[in-house]
Amino acid sequence: MRLFLDCEFNGFGGGLISMALVAEDGREWYEVVPCEQPEAWVVRNVIPILGKEPVSIDVMQRSLFLWLARFESIHIVADWPEDIAHFCSALITSPGRRISTPPLTMEVLKIDSQSTMPHNALHDARALREAVMHKEGI
Protein backbone atom coordinates (compact mmCIF):
# COMPACT_ATOMS: atom_id res chain seq x y z
CA MET A 1 0.00 0.00 0.00
CA ARG A 2 1.32 3.44 -0.85
CA LEU A 3 1.35 5.82 2.11
CA PHE A 4 1.76 9.51 1.37
CA LEU A 5 3.92 11.23 3.98
CA ASP A 6 4.29 14.79 5.14
CA CYS A 7 6.03 16.22 8.19
CA GLU A 8 6.31 19.64 9.75
CA PHE A 9 9.49 20.45 11.60
CA ASN A 10 11.09 23.32 13.49
CA GLY A 11 12.90 25.10 10.65
CA PHE A 12 15.44 23.68 8.25
CA GLY A 13 17.02 20.62 9.89
CA GLY A 14 14.90 21.14 13.02
CA GLY A 15 13.07 18.70 15.20
CA LEU A 16 9.82 17.01 14.26
CA ILE A 17 6.56 18.81 15.09
CA SER A 18 3.98 16.69 13.27
CA MET A 19 3.76 13.74 10.92
CA ALA A 20 0.94 12.49 8.71
CA LEU A 21 0.44 9.46 6.50
CA VAL A 22 -2.46 9.10 4.09
CA ALA A 23 -2.99 5.73 2.44
CA GLU A 24 -4.04 5.25 -1.17
CA ASP A 25 -7.42 4.07 0.11
CA GLY A 26 -7.88 7.23 2.19
CA ARG A 27 -7.03 5.92 5.66
CA GLU A 28 -5.17 8.54 7.68
CA TRP A 29 -2.74 8.75 10.57
CA TYR A 30 -1.64 12.05 12.15
CA GLU A 31 0.27 12.91 15.30
CA VAL A 32 1.78 16.03 16.82
CA VAL A 33 4.73 16.03 19.23
CA PRO A 34 5.96 18.81 21.53
CA CYS A 35 8.11 21.51 19.95
CA GLU A 36 10.62 23.07 22.30
CA GLN A 37 11.72 26.59 21.38
CA PRO A 38 9.87 26.87 18.06
CA GLU A 39 11.30 29.29 15.51
CA ALA A 40 9.30 32.49 14.96
CA TRP A 41 8.13 31.32 11.51
CA VAL A 42 6.87 28.06 13.03
CA VAL A 43 5.02 29.95 15.78
CA ARG A 44 3.23 32.04 13.13
CA ASN A 45 2.62 29.43 10.43
CA VAL A 46 2.59 25.90 11.88
CA ILE A 47 1.64 25.83 15.57
CA PRO A 48 -1.73 27.63 15.12
CA ILE A 49 -2.98 25.10 12.54
CA LEU A 50 -1.82 21.81 14.06
CA GLY A 51 -5.40 20.95 15.04
CA LYS A 52 -4.31 18.44 17.64
CA GLU A 53 -2.65 18.42 21.05
CA PRO A 54 0.92 17.10 21.20
CA VAL A 55 1.68 13.63 22.53
CA SER A 56 5.01 12.25 23.69
CA ILE A 57 7.37 10.68 21.18
CA ASP A 58 6.71 7.30 22.84
CA VAL A 59 2.96 7.65 22.35
CA MET A 60 3.49 8.77 18.74
CA GLN A 61 5.74 5.78 18.03
CA ARG A 62 3.23 3.33 19.55
CA SER A 63 0.43 4.88 17.48
CA LEU A 64 2.60 4.70 14.34
CA PHE A 65 3.44 1.04 15.01
CA LEU A 66 -0.22 0.10 15.42
CA TRP A 67 -1.25 1.97 12.27
CA LEU A 68 1.54 0.57 10.07
CA ALA A 69 0.82 -2.98 11.27
CA ARG A 70 -2.48 -2.89 9.32
CA PHE A 71 -0.65 -3.15 6.01
CA GLU A 72 0.99 -6.18 4.35
CA SER A 73 3.64 -3.99 2.74
CA ILE A 74 4.30 -0.26 2.64
CA HIS A 75 5.65 2.12 0.04
CA ILE A 76 6.21 5.58 1.54
CA VAL A 77 5.86 8.48 -0.91
CA ALA A 78 7.09 11.95 0.04
CA ASP A 79 7.86 15.15 -1.80
CA TRP A 80 10.73 16.27 0.43
CA PRO A 81 13.76 14.23 1.64
CA GLU A 82 13.61 15.60 5.17
CA ASP A 83 10.14 14.06 5.57
CA ILE A 84 11.69 10.65 4.90
CA ALA A 85 14.46 11.40 7.41
CA HIS A 86 11.92 12.27 10.13
CA PHE A 87 9.86 9.17 9.33
CA CYS A 88 12.95 6.96 9.61
CA SER A 89 13.95 8.63 12.88
CA ALA A 90 10.46 7.95 14.25
CA LEU A 91 11.01 4.23 13.62
CA ILE A 92 13.99 4.19 16.02
CA THR A 93 12.84 3.70 19.62
CA SER A 94 16.19 3.37 21.43
CA PRO A 95 19.77 2.34 20.67
CA GLY A 96 19.61 -0.83 18.59
CA ARG A 97 15.78 -1.00 18.72
CA ARG A 98 13.14 0.05 16.22
CA ILE A 99 9.47 -0.23 15.43
CA SER A 100 8.70 -3.43 13.60
CA THR A 101 7.14 -2.64 10.22
CA PRO A 102 5.78 -4.59 7.30
CA PRO A 103 8.19 -4.70 4.32
CA LEU A 104 8.92 -1.06 3.55
CA THR A 105 10.19 0.95 0.56
CA MET A 106 10.36 4.70 0.01
CA GLU A 107 10.52 7.28 -2.75
CA VAL A 108 10.80 11.04 -3.00
CA LEU A 109 8.88 12.66 -5.85
CA LYS A 110 9.06 16.12 -7.29
CA ILE A 111 5.41 17.02 -7.81
CA ASP A 112 3.29 20.11 -7.34
CA SER A 113 0.46 19.69 -4.86
CA GLN A 114 -2.06 22.22 -3.60
CA SER A 115 -2.81 21.80 0.08
CA THR A 116 -6.02 23.25 1.48
CA MET A 117 -4.04 24.18 4.60
CA PRO A 118 -0.32 24.55 3.82
CA HIS A 119 2.06 23.69 6.68
CA ASN A 120 -0.39 21.25 8.27
CA ALA A 121 1.11 17.80 7.74
CA LEU A 122 -2.25 16.03 7.41
CA HIS A 123 -3.58 18.46 4.80
CA ASP A 124 -0.25 18.40 2.95
CA ALA A 125 -0.19 14.56 2.90
CA ARG A 126 -3.75 14.55 1.56
CA ALA A 127 -2.72 17.01 -1.16
CA LEU A 128 0.29 14.87 -2.09
CA ARG A 129 -1.96 11.81 -2.40
CA GLU A 130 -4.41 13.71 -4.57
CA ALA A 131 -1.66 15.14 -6.81
CA VAL A 132 -0.02 11.75 -7.38
CA MET A 133 -3.29 9.94 -8.00
CA HIS A 134 -4.49 12.70 -10.35
CA LYS A 135 -1.23 12.50 -12.30
CA GLU A 136 -1.73 8.73 -12.61
CA GLY A 137 -5.33 9.20 -13.73
CA ILE A 138 -6.76 7.52 -10.63
Residue locations for each model-derived region?
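Acidic, Mg2+-coordinating catalytic module of metal-dependent nucleases/exonucleases
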Residues: 80, 111-138
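Conserved non-catalytic scaffold segment of RNase H-like nuclease domains
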Residues: 3, 8-82
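Short, surface-exposed basic-aromatic patches at helix termini and helix-loop junctions that form
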Residues: 22-23, 92-95, 137
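Short, flexible loop segments at boundaries between secondary-structure elements
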Residues: 97-116
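Residue-level signal for well-ordered alpha-helical scaffold segments within enzymatic catalytic domains
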Residues: 66, 86-89, 130, 134
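Substrate-recognition/cap helix-loop segment adjacent to the acidic, metal-dependent catalytic center
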Residues: 84-101
